[in-house]
């Protein structure tokens, strides 16, 4: 199981590459990893805000992040999450 620090380091090293390849405005980790409550089978929850349409490339982005971190990732678009759910995860957001 990777630590949150390892994940932040991996995402940080690849941030510019991902932001250049995809129309990403911001990217944040939330959920168990951001609260340091992850267990061996936890996935990584990532909220991404886009500055342009991404379309089917959303799947490519999710797969690419999964390859970088080496385990299951659940990527959520900021536009795709209802405001009431965003308010629930907002305190957990750690931008990378």
Q: What is each model feature region?
A:
Residues 29:
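Conserved histidines in hydrophobic membrane contexts and catalytic metal-binding motifs
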Residues 45-48:
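Short beta-strand->loop micro-motif that forms the acidic, two-metal-ion catalytic signature
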Residues 1-26, 34-40, 50-96:
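Catalytic core of pol beta-like nucleotidyltransferases
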């Amino acid at each position: 199981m990777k630590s949150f620090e390892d994940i932040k380091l991996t995402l940080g090293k690849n941030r510019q590459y991902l932001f250049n390849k995809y129309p990403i405005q911001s990217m944040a980790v939330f959920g168990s990893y951001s609260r340091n409550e992850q267990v061996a089978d936890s996935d990584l929850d990532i909220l991404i805000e886009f500055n342009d349409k991404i379309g089917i490339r959303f799947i490519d982005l999710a797969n690419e992040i999964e390859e970088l971190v080496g385990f299951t990732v659940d990527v959520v678009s900021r536009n795709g999450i209802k405001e009431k759910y965003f308010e629930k995860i907002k305190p957990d957001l750690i931008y990378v």
